[in-house]
Amino acid sequence: MNTMNTALQIRIISAVLAIIALTAWPTTATAPYTAIIMESGSPYFVPKSATVSTGAPIRWENPTPTEHTATHVGCLEDGESCAFDTGIVLPNNTFTLPGLAPGRYPYVCRIHPIMHGVIIVTDPAATPSHL
């Protein structure tokens, strides 16, 4: 009887350790991001207006055969704060911005000024919850 209890205890301990090991295994999940596609035709940036939460990553994807940029208009105006500039995003490449503070960020393609969009960053912590 004592041997059976010991065997049962070993099985239970083994099962518990296996569960702990499986739930503690590190994951390689990445934070979700908002994708903005650079297009060759209107509206050029899809979506043209993107709303994201504070600190949420934003990724520009360039599937076109042409180079593009996504440059905050503050980078182009004297005395203004430059929030981001992707630099040249080559064809079939991407640029990911780790996140922005709350605000409204209009941007353009420096190579093709007809291309423009806006990122609106909200702070979910500042929004009162409804019960």
What are these regions (language model features)?
Residues Q9, A24-L131:
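Extracytoplasmic copper-binding redox domains, predominantly the cupredoxin/blue-copper superfamily
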Residues S14-A24:
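Bacterial N-terminal signal peptides
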Residues T3-I13:
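Bacterial N-terminal signal peptides that target proteins for export
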Residues M1-M4, A29:
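Universal eukaryotic N-terminal targeting presequences
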